[in-house]
Regions:
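Extracytoplasmic/secreted cell-surface and envelope-processing proteins
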Residues: 127-131
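Nucleic-acid enzyme cleavage-core boundary/entry regions
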Residues: 1-116, 132-249
């Protein structure tokens, strides 16, 4: 992942920042890189595949114990390209339906597991902080199941307590924040709500793949022994089990 216009800031991250370079300049660098290195080590944009892949019935008869669900296809694609799913014996999907060719089949396999653990990996954005809520309450995902959901994503409070994070601001994000379900908003502090309502957000893609993978690995490892880690927080102890792992910061 190439981090555009990154700059270190020694102040609270409540003001949106601008890129130092133009899109055309960035494209020229990428084209030059391709001329020298080829396409081998660059991930293309996640593409939509209208045709589902055929999976052996011997495989579909089984299920996964764990799944990482990302709030965008690019992060899911990066994890898969780096064999994260093999190393952690888990499925990797995006809330947007990536990878399309096997998405429906894998989701059906997951729903058959009564002991499924779900790890949500997301941006510090309105759609990101709503990811766990959507996974829990959408009939397209894990509504009315026993799946336990863990939040491994970026949270606004982690951004507010950090320095040198690239904060983006948009009117659209502000509008989305103010339209978040009440159940999502009440799990956020007043400072977090103010930050989101101002239109601020931080993308996971602004961090290196190495760091994202490390955080996800560490989060999953901590969850294996939650009693030994004070960074694992139960935020809703009703019929739904949702945990937050304080990983970024």
């Amino acid at each position: 992942s190439i981090y555009l216009g990154y700059r270190q800031l020694n102040r609270i991250n409540d003001i949106g920042q601008s890129f130092f370079i133009s899109e055309s300049q960035f494209d020229s660098w990428i084209n030059r890189w391709k001329e020298i290195n080829g396409f081998e080590k660059m991930l293309p944009f996640p593409r939509e595949e209208s045709t589902a892949s055929l999976i052996s019935t011997e495989i579909t008869a089984y299920s996964f114990d764990r799944v990482v669900v990302c709030d965008n296809a690019a992060i899911a694609q990066m994890l898969i390209a780096n064999n994260f799913h093999f190393e952690n014996s888990c499925a990797v999907l995006s809330i947007t339906g990536y990878p399309e060719s096997i998405f429906t089949t894998v989701l059906e396999m997951l729903r058959r597991n009564p002991d499924l653990k779900v790890y949500a990996l997301h941006d510090a954005s309105p759609s990101g902080v709503a990811l766990v809520y959507n996974l829990r309450n959408s009939p397209d995902w894990f509504f009315n199941t026993n799946a336990v959901i863990y939040d491994l994503g970026l949270l606004p409070r982690q951004i507010l307590s950090s320095q040198g994070v690239f904060v983006i601001n948009s009117a659209e994000s502000s509008q989305q924040a103010q339209q978040l379900p009440e159940e999502v908003r009440r799990d956020l502090t007043s400072e977090e709500l103010k930050w989101l309502d101002m239109g601020n957000f931080v993308e996971l893609e602004s961090f290196s793949p190495q760091r994202i993978i490390r955080v996800a690995n560490q989060g999953i490892a901590k969850i294996q022994a939650p009693d030994s880690s004070d960074s694992l927080i139960l935020i809703d102890s009703g019929a739904d089990s949702v945990y937050v792992v304080e990983s970024f910061g």
